[in-house]
Amino acid sequence: MSHDPQPLGGKIISKPVMIFGPLIVICMLLIVKRLVFGLGSVSDLNGGFPWGVWIAFDLLIGTGFACGGWALAWAVYVFNRGQYHPLVRPALLASLFGYSLGGLSITIDVGRYWNLPYFYIPGHFNVNSVLFETAVCMTIYIGVMALEFAPALFERLGWKVSLQRLNKVMFFIIALGALLPTMHQSSMGSLMISAGYKVHPLWQSYEMLPLFSLLTAFIMGFSIVIFEGSLVQAGLRGNGPDEKSLFVKLTNTISVLLAIFIVLRFGELIYRDKLSLAFAGDFYSVMFWIEVLLMLFPLVVLRVAKLRNDSRMLFLSALSALLGCATWRLTYSLVAFNPGGGYAYFPTWEELLISIGFVAIEICAYIVLIRLLPILPPLKQNDHNRHEASKA
């Protein structure tokens, strides 16, 4: 049996596409409204909160969820764990969508979006800006991911010569793909260092924020591979390739990274004499313990062999790790930020609908492309299974 990726086939306009389609339309209409009538027409952003849910969720959390391709690139190509190679293309596709939509969120969040091209014009570079590094590095990485994913398109179109030429330089492209997120994911942690005391002490750490951001990127990257793979398997009604053994192996890496993060998190609080704030009994201490417990759950569960080999517990553990890291990113960038001056922020329903629409776009585009392009490993060779999968 061939292990080469194959198009899933089946109907393009499936039930999930029909369900999420209206959300995409609403999202697009609201984006047009924002671009034409300004930020105030759809958002609650103000002078104290220059960025909100579009940055905290769509960018910081969204690109964290999109780190699956990057995390697997390190596992497969840097640490030579070739057994994970079947997981690379699905993860890379999700990463490409996640980062692209994260870039779009920046575009709609910036007040004078027509000035964005100045980021890339020599003479206008602000090389001391973390925002500059993040924006330019992300843009380059999106292009790198497009090149990494191009072989799937070339194979589908039968462009053998182009595929051969691309494969000759793929080693360099992969090296860039492994390097670039290491830079901008750590920089995303540096974004709030300049906010100083305006970020609650439980999350403000001038030395550790970049490292915490990088660690959560790796944790989210490996966890999303298990999460998305489990959903695909459920969507194919159990007829997809059996990748559970690979997921179980990934849990070892996730457990180590979670342990490192938690130890460093508490170590920093103890060293800076801030641990008492975690027991203050206020809103921020509750958010802190929610974050910690969400990360402790998979750390405990994944240490028990029986639970680790259970598909449902694998899924729940990956989901818990994702939510824990997402909570940390949301809190340090938005919830724990207090600019003073009486400023307050809460996302409007239009802001939330745009963010929900981004998720809907990614889901629908992912479903469409796995049906058209060789992304997933072959299904189990059974006519009934193929029929069931095509209806998914």
Curated annotation (Swiss-Prot):
Coiled coil: none annotated. GO terms for cellular component: [Ni-Fe] hydrogenase complex; plasma membrane. InterPro entries: FDH_cytochrome_b556_subunit, NrfD-like. The keyword Transmembrane applies. It comes from the Bacteria. Residues 1-11, 56-58, 112-133, 190-207, 271-281, 355 are periplasmic. The chain crosses the membrane at residues 12-32, 35-55, 59-79, 91-111, 134-154, 169-189, 208-228, 250-270, 282-302, 334-354, 356-376. It is found in: Cell inner membrane. It is a multi-pass membrane protein. GO terms for biological process: anaerobic electron transport chain; anaerobic respiration. Residues 33-34, 80-90, 155-168, 229-249, 303-333, 377-392 are cytoplasmic. Keywords: Cell inner membrane, Cell membrane, Electron transport, Heme, Iron, Membrane, Metal-binding, Transmembrane, Transmembrane helix, Transport. GO terms for molecular function: metal ion binding. Probable b-type cytochrome. Belongs to the NrfD family. This is Probable Ni/Fe-hydrogenase 2 b-type cytochrome subunit. It comes from Escherichia coli (strain K12).
